[in-house]
């Protein structure tokens, strides 16, 4: 083993890491007398230490002010959702008026499709990737059926064309060109949840808009993971969850982006009173006057207690900056790839693309010997306090998150793989 693959080298990298102090801003689950080796921030991010104080602040305001907390106090609930707006916009590469924290991902996807999926007799198809996250597929199929359309004829899936189960841009481009005259909407992920493949959203937008289709994105595995430029890319809408890389807690409030070209449009929408312009909302007029931008798609008043942990996490993103986080992420995941290829190549096959521009922090791994061996390794890791996650039928996902993971965590993971293989 070369020095570059030694734990001593990893410890040196950790000592030189300019972001190392951010780890102390999170609460780690324990395994015996030590922190878990937590490599599953792609499923649920860790709790920011500041989250408890920010939740307590809301509880204290509720206890002392009651309903008046909507309009008075240190953080008025009427505008609490706007406390996370600017930081969210920086994370996704948007203008502040293009983003809002509301609802959850699947709810927001339905709201966006109600506005942006406008099928006609000639143009009614929706294009997605084969193997999309099930909730996305459920949403798409139900939207088609709500319009009286058959998913068998109006849902187009782009099949993986690479040996590792990923998609080439050529395959995506060919599908958009082939079905272009029929396409009403292209719904695409920033990162595919099972394989960890990242996509060139700007190019997908260019191809789809050239065919006259709208473009929406599911950014569940991209937001807070890779730099995004939604405004410049020209995406019509995007939705995401905030409980993975944005560390806002289980079942956290979601996020939504609507490009500013739609800010004052007359697009049909499913409306609610919190989407009404703020200045006249409490007049209780019967006519709906939408707030400009993404806030005009809000339905009900924001879940303030759920927004508080997101606010705590976004403070850390502003402190670090997405560029620095991405630079560390590329080094972490690159080091993990090196370790796997050097020490356990006979055990683990890397599904995720090798090029940093085509992945985020996650590596999706298949275990030699098939599903039974994969489950055996996964359970061994869990028992040893090394947490990744499992996605059927046969993938272990490992995600070194730059906010709180260390290079030495990757040695712990690979060391446990070696121990399992030797048993």
From Swiss-Prot:
Q: What's this chain's function?
A: Catalyzes the cleavage of L-kynurenine (L-Kyn) and L-3-hydroxykynurenine (L-3OHKyn) into anthranilic acid (AA) and 3-hydroxyanthranilic acid (3-OHAA), respectively.
- What protein name is recorded for this chain? Kynureninase
Pathway(s) annotated for this protein in UniProt: Amino-acid degradation; L-kynurenine degradation; L-alanine and anthranilate from L-kynurenine: step 1/1; Cofactor biosynthesis; NAD(+) biosynthesis; quinolinate from L-kynurenine: step 2/3
Keyword Hydrolase attributed: yes
Q: Which Gene3D superfamilies match?
A: Aspartate Aminotransferase, domain 1, Type I PLP-dependent aspartate aminotransferase-like (Major domain)
* Class in the EC hierarchy, top level: hydrolase
PTM N6-(pyridoxal phosphate)lysine: list the residues: 244
Q: Which organism is it from?
A: Xanthomonas oryzae pv. oryzae (strain KACC10331 / KXO85)
One of the GO BP terms on file: L-kynurenine catabolic process
Give the EC number(s) listed in the UniProt record: 3.7.1.3
């Amino acid at each position: 083993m070369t020095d570059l693959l030694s734990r001593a080298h990893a410890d040196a990298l950790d000592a030189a890491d300019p972001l190392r102090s951010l780890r102390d801003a999170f609460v780690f689950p324990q395994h015996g007398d030590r922190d878990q080796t937590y490599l599953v921030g792609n499923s649920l991010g860790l709790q920011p230490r500041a989250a408890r104080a920010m939740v307590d602040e809301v509880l204290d305001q509720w206890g002392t002010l009651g309903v008046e907390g909507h309009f008075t106090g240190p953080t008025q609930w009427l505008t609490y959702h706007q406390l996370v707006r600017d930081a969210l916009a920086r994370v996704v590469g948007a203008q502040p008026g293009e983003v809002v924290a509301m609802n959850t991902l699947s709810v927001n996807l339905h709201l966006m499709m109600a506005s942006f999926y406008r099928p006609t007799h000639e143009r009614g198809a929706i294009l997605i990737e084969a193997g999309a996250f099930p909730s996305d597929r459920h949403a798409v199929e139900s939207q088609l059926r709500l319009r009286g359309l058959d998913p068998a004829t109006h849902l187009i899936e782009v099949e993986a064309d690479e040996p590792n189960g990923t998609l080439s841009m050529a395959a995506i481009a060919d599908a958009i060109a082939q079905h272009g005259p029929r396409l009403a909407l292209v719904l695409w992920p920033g990162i595919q949840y099972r394989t960890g493949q990242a996509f060139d959203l700007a190019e997908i937008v260019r191809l789809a808009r050239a065919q006259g289709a709208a473009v929406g994105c599911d950014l569940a595995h991209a937001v807070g993971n890779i730099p995004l430029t939604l405004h410049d890319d020209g995406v019509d809408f995007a939705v995401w969850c905030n409980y993975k890389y944005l560390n806002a807690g289980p079942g956290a409030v979601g996020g939504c982006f609507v490009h500013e070209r739609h800010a004052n449009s007359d697009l049909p929408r499913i409306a609610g009173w919190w989407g009404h312009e703020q200045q006249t909302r409490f007049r209780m007029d019967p006519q709906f006057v939408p707030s400009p931008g993404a806030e005009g798609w809000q339905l009900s008043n924001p879940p303030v207690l759920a927004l508080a942990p997101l606010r705590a996490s976004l403070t850390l993103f502003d402190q670090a900056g997405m560029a620095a986080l991405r630079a560390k992420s590329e080094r972490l995941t690159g080091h993990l790839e090196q370790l796997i290829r050097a020490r356990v190549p006979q055990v683990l096959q890397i599904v995720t693309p090798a090029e940093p521009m085509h992945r985020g922090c996650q590596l999706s791994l298949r275990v030699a010997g098939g599903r039974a061996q994969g489950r055996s390794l996964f359970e061994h890791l869990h028992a040893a306090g090394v947490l990744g996650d499992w996605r059927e039928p046969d993938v272990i996902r490992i995600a070194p998150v730059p906010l709180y993971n260390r290079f030495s965590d990757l040695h712990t993971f690979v060391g446990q793989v070696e121990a399992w293989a030797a048993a």
